[in-house]
Amino acid sequence: METVVSGIRSTGKLHLGNFYGAVKNFVQMQNEYNCYFFIADYHSLTTHPTPEDLHGNVRQVLVEYLAAGIDPEKATIYVQSDVPEIAELYLYLNMNAYLGELERSTSFKDKVRAHPDNVNAGLLTYPVLMAADILIHKATKVPVGKDQEQHLEMSRTFGNRFNRLYKTEYFPEPFAFNFTEKLVKVPGLDGKGKMGKSEGEGNAVYLSDEPEVIRKKVMRAVSDGGPTEENQQKPEAIQNLFDLMKIVSSADTYDHFDSLYNQCAIRYGDFKKQLAEDMILSTAPIREKINEIARDETYLREVARFGAIKARESASKTIREVRQIIGFKSF
């Protein structure tokens, strides 16, 4: 059975983009693959969270993983920092990662532009840590979005470089994988691209948002004065809202409002109300489970403990073998 590895940074609550773009696929994958789904708390340290926020965010993602349908009996769910072997492999891979290639990372350059006062080594070596996350379980399939494909390519580079250096074929090549044929891209509500935790207030709809919060966010979403010509191209902000409707609403509902737009007869108030209600309906089962699971501290501790044991079984085997390949031996 092939191994799948993926994770989500513990930087806050999960939103519709996380669910439809990743976690929904995780739930399907767990039935057919050997899956490791982790909470990436090491990665979140680049933004310097407080200890309280770090722990709270890890707990929140764990709750929401479970509420969304990831089953700890089928998949290994674990917290990244509970598997110290990842940090050790990260160290070894760093010894063969070079400044030039790390500085060419598109993600690194974007972060430098956005936060020039926080250009830390963790940001620079982010792709190396991602490679360690993947290679520690010798994964061959990695569900990633378009923005992570370069990092996955670098993971292959680091694994192949290790193999060449030590004249082995130890690490397999990991490749991008999505359970469905088409990668779902979930736009935000601010009219400027994808939904994300760091994209500003009002951009994201969270799985835990109460109905009234969702209604307010959607009604405030960026729109315009409406179409002035029949069948005109939708501007980005409006196209984003229609893309959201395509994800959460029925095909008939989408076609109805698309037809109204093309006839210059759409009322954005009615359109947004429908979109909000469909978002509320689509997230209701998860929201109810979040509230239920969040109260069960014993269950959460047990899931995290069980996941750490399973993940370390795989990771410790890899590290033992990597040490031998490198030449670390006890006297």
Where are these regions (language model features)?
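N-terminal Rossmann-like or analogous alpha/beta NTP/dinucleotide-binding catalytic cores
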Residues: 2-132, 291
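Short, solvent-exposed beta-strand edge segments and adjacent coil->beta transition regions
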Residues: 11, 139, 200-202
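Conserved nucleotide- and phosphate/pyrophosphate-binding catalytic cores
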Residues: 18, 150, 156-331
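A generic secondary-structure signal for well-formed alpha-helical elements
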Residues: 62, 69, 97-100, 139, ...
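Short helix-capping/linker segments at secondary-structure and domain boundaries
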Residues: 99-103, 136-143, 249-257, 287
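Internal, conserved structured core segments that host functional sites
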Residues: 110-162, 166, 187
